[in-house]
């Protein structure tokens, strides 16, 4: 009894402290902790069987005051809700709802929510301030803030484009990423070599390629998540802050006009993908062609997924997304305009390769040419790669500037004597200057090298057809008809290619071969090959008719066929 009196005295002295801790006696002015608030919310509730246990403990404790049936004293019931294996310390019940399998820890959850607020709250506060200051509808606030934010990122995009343009210039001069077959170098050694060569020539870091995308995508997810949070929390004004078919920004797309937003998102994403890959400089380089194609295919397939995903997002988030995509399309279109890109220094540097109508060889003997993208600065043709030299010479050749194209082709062959395309184009240029002997030599050399490798690739087969065709014509123009027919016959005996471009060259060679063997008196054989040509190109029907009816083919017909082939 003495022990009970001491304990009761202690409880009376500590009654105020215990009451302040009880969830049933929280002062109205006291701010509850986040764990207790979550505990009392409708999202978290005590399991029903735990409630029944607590009720039973309460009843037992009341019934057991002064009784020894259950071995429970009133003082013990205060310290513990029972001694039958379900004892719950009140202090522990705040952090955990029991020790019988129903414990819920709120510490980690509150920390996650705190981190979530830490990321999104600044954006929400910024949008709230903008809305309070301007008084604009929420849909205008979301759209205009998106445009303002993307405009702020524009300098980063311009800088990144300049760096990627420089990277595309240096890439042809860099070694391969992977060690060539038979080089004996490991992948690590090859990467070290690539890094060393990149630094030696002053090529910017490849981290510039994903730089803007990384920043933009991070900001995109932060912004769209913040607006989604506002929509799901029914932010003040969001229920009626929309327009047109999206009056309620907190709802997901529904009703008759529900598919409009998803269709708009998918269409804008697809359009933006096409414009982006058209404007990119890096993906035009051979080293990145396959990677860029695969990534573009992935983004195109993603269009369908985004359509269905949009049905699960609030219309406030979809409004931001549509505005963001629309800005991207407008931004790409403006930056790709020749005048704008020239002013900003973003003009693609494949002008040497694809805009040879502007570069002018001011002094081919001194090896100088004008690069219009560098505002008149002269660059040396000796610094160009063989591929760039051939591309430039082909432009001059197609424009009738044979005298300018031939020195470039010879320079390309000096740098790479095995460059077959340079040999063939040089032979064509020499043929057009009536230098048939030298033209035949170049073309026969190219055909011989191709035959040694037994070509199977589409490009190699096409080069063999073109080289043999022009070699045959060059020999015939020298009076070496038998040698010329031999080259043309090689093409006639080849399997008809499936590639449209190769097939066109193949049919041209058959026309020349038919004309040559008809002049040698092989009329029936010539008609046989012409029938194969007419099956694809009826424009040669008149030539076939003359071949079948007359003993001679008019010279004009042969000239026309040769001219068409050229």
Swiss-Prot record:
One of its GO terms (molecular function) is membrane insertase activity. SUPFAM superfamilies: TPR-like. The chain crosses the membrane at residues 139-159, 207-227, 249-269, 301-321. One of its GO terms (biological process) is mitochondrial cytochrome c oxidase assembly. TPR repeats lie at residues 386-419, 420-453, 465-498, 507-540. One of its GO terms (cellular component) is mitochondrial inner membrane. This is ALBINO3-like protein 3, mitochondrial. It comes from Arabidopsis thaliana (Mouse-ear cress).
């Amino acid at each position: 009894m003495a022990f009970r009196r001491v304990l009761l005295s202690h409880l009376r002295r500590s009654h105020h402290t215990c009451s302040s801790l009880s969830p049933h006696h929280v002062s109205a002015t006291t701010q509850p902790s986040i764990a207790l608030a979550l505990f009392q919310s409708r999202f978290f509730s005590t399991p029903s069987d735990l409630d029944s246990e607590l009720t039973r403990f309460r009843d037992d404790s009341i019934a057991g005051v002064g009784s020894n049936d259950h071995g429970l004293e009133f003082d013990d019931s205060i310290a513990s809700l029972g001694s039958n294996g379900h004892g719950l310390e009140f202090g522990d019940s705040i952090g955990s709802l029991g020790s019988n399998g129903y414990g819920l820890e709120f510490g980690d959850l509150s920390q996650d929510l705190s981190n979530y607020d830490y990321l999104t709250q600044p954006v929400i506060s910024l949008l709230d301030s903008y809305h309070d200051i301007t008084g604009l509808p929420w849909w205008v606030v979301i759209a205009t803030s998106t445009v303002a934010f993307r405009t702020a990122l524009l300098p980063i995009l311009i800088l990144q484009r300049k760096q990627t343009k420089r990277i595309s210039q240096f890439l042809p001069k860099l070694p391969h990423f992977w060690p060539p077959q038979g080089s004996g170098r490991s992948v690590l050694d090859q990467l070290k070599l690539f890094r060393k060569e990149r630094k030696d020539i002053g090529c910017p870091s490849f981290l510039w390629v994903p730089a803007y995308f990384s920043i933009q995508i991070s900001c995109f997810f932060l912004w769209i998540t913040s607006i989604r949070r506002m929509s799901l929390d029914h932010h003040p004004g969001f229920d009626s802050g929309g327009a047109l078919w999206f009056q309620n920004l907190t709802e997901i797309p529904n009703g008759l006009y529900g598919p409009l937003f998803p269709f708009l998102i998918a269409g804008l994403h697809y359009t933006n993908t096409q414009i982006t890959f058209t404007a990119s400089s890096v993906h035009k380089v051979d080293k990145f062609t396959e990677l860029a194609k695969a990534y573009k295919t992935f983004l195109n397939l993603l269009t369908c997924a985004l359509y269905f995903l949009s049905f699960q997002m609030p219309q406030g988030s979809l409004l931001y997304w549509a505005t963001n995509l629309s800005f991207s399309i407008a931004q790409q279109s403006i930056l790709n305009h020749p005048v704008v890109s020239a002013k900003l220094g973003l003009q693609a540097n494949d002008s040497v390769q694809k805009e040879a109508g502007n570069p002018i060889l001011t002094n081919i003997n001194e090896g100088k040419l004008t690069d219009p993208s560098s505002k008149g600065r002269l660059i040396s043709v000796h610094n160009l790669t063989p591929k760039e030299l051939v591309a430039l010479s082909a432009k001059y050749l197609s424009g009738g500037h044979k005298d300018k194209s031939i020195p470039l082709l010879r320079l390309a062959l000096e740098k790479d004597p095995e460059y077959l395309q340079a040999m063939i184009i040089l032979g064509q240029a020499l043929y057009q200057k009536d230098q048939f002997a030298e033209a035949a030599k170049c073309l026969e050399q190219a055909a011989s090298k191709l035959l040694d490798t037994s070509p199977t690739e589409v490009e190699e087969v096409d080069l063999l057809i073109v080289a043999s065709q022009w070699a045959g014509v060059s020999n015939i123009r020298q009076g070496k008809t038998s040698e010329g027919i031999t080259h043309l016959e090689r093409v006639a005996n080849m399997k008809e290619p499936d590639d449209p471009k190769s097939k066109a060259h193949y049919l041209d060679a058959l026309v020349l071969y038919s004309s040559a063997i008809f002049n040698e008196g092989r009329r029936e054989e010539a008609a046989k090959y012409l029938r194969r040509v007419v099956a694809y190109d009826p424009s040669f029907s008149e030539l076939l008719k003359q071949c079948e009816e007359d003993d001679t083919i008019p010279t004009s017909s042969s000239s026309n066929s040769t001219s068409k082939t050229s």
